[in-house]
């Protein structure tokens, strides 16, 4: 687990439970494929986390305005926004997130609309054909993602 308690009272490197909200605080630099120039342009506008990005660019008009102000392409910004949105789902991670993107699942609400069994099968077949990951996600993992997606608020339109 990436979140460790290193406080004296925590007893050393004890893994902490991660909640779905932790993805909100993911630094922009941890999202896949963020060029340094784009990260620095967003930092000028005080956007350094996924939560800040989703708050500032959750709808098309806001994305267009931020892209113009930060002098980045709307395509780059859209890609970061959808990756920040999916990062809210615990367990998706970079590789499985890219696999979901390839299957056209770009937002949390897209994931919520999926049938877990069908999505699991699609992910398995996709991974067998391109070997994007060492392993395909399990049915239990996919079911957990879809359940989380149902419980998360819609932040991207």
Per-region residue spans from a language model:
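C-terminal extensions
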Residues: 1-157
């Amino acid at each position: 687990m990436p979140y460790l308690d290193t406080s004296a009272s925590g007893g050393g490197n004890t893994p902490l439970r991660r909640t779905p909200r932790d993805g909100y605080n993911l630094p922009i630099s941890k999202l896949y494929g963020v060029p340094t120039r784009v990260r620095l342009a967003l930092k000028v506008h005080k956007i350094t986390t996924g939560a800040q990005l989703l708050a500032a660019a959750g709808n098309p008009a806001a994305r267009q305005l931020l892209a113009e102000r930060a002098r980045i392409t709307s395509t780059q910004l859209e890609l970061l926004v959808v990756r920040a949105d999916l990062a809210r789902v615990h367990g998706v991670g970079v590789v499985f997130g890219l696999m979901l993107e390839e299957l056209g699942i770009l937002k949390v609400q897209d994931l919520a609309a999926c049938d877990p069994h069908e999505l699991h099968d699609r992910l398995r077949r996709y991974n067998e054909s391109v070997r994007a990951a060492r392993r395909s996600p399990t049915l239990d993992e996919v079911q957990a993602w879809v359940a989380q997606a149902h419980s998360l608020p819609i932040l991207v339109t």
